[in-house]
């Protein structure tokens, strides 16, 4: 098992985007909303809630360092907060496919001035930094923004899977993060630092976010290099432990909870934002108008044609079918015998493994004729795998599964494709944090 509590430094790249046009520039490239006004160009691009936040344009000056909007498309009250806390988001390509996931931070978190220009830090995996910088410069054109790598800043992640920490985060957000206007956001961000609710004195905090991709999943924070200095205050440490863990431990925890990041998959994998559960992880706005890749995304949401989603999976030897069938959540075990079989498969080759039903039957899809007059030939069935493996570590992983399949069964088998065509089992799990 991975540690239930941990603090890690993550291999992330940080790109700073600042200048008079920074809010408009970033808004046009990501799936979350930064502009208070909605520019309506096509009827299907704006949801019916389009007029419910008209006051935002009165309290937000997009040419100043105002912060970020926090919203949840599944919140029935449709509340939007204005905060200095960071948010989860995505960059898409022009075809609506995922370019990269990211976190966006208001910069700096505290000690900001209302007279400063908009200033953001975008956090992505280090392996995707060069590609993202090229994308940003491609779209810059005449925009009055500066794009630069943020040097000598570290990305940290802390998680704690106890009810006490969950309650702590609820109170923390209510007291410091869920603010309604830029002035209050600046005041509460500074108070969080001054109160030492989390961070010790003189810790150079650059950015902060509660990771709500899954409710209260952890906290993310950016600091100038700490040189092994403990970031937490005495008050925080009196309540919670903070043992050091690896970035790999953080990734395995994501896997077992069904949370994909683009760096987890090989570069030739093409995936849609809804397939990564972006709508479930507070990374999508339906009320922001146009952005790169937006049209397909909103049409998919409104059309309700989401057939596949990423879910956590556990691999097992087929002799353990009965014990696996009784499990309700994946259990990470690097010493599981099935790991020896999986070690023969490279990350790039994972997606080519065929997931099939345990009973040996094939998933099928109707093959519809394109003729308006139908066809005299019998309707054919097109064979389709039950899903695609995207990432793995040890005996757990992430797979893109057909929702129609996993609604009826969770046990599948996979042929490794070695000399003996070894077959292993795969169990899919529907995360408990998915909206009902």
Curated annotation (Swiss-Prot):
Record-level GO BP terms: iron-sulfur cluster assembly
PANTHER family in alphabetical order: TRANSFERASE CAF17, MITOCHONDRIAL-RELATED
Keyword match Mitochondrion: yes
Identification of the protein by name: Iron-sulfur cluster assembly factor IBA57 homolog, mitochondrial
One Gene Ontology term, aspect cellular component: mitochondrial matrix
Entry's family note: Belongs to the GcvT family. CAF17/IBA57 subfamily.
GO molecular function: transferase activity
Cellular localization per UniProt: Mitochondrion matrix
Key words, A-Z: Mitochondrion, Transit peptide
Main location as per UniProt: mitochondrion
Species name: Meyerozyma guilliermondii (strain ATCC 6260 / CBS 566 / DSM 6381 / JCM 1539 / NBRC 10279 / NRRL Y-324)
Region feature Disordered, mapped onto this chain: 359-387
Transit peptide: 1-42
Domain of life: Eukaryota
Keyword tRNA processing appears in the UniProt entry: no
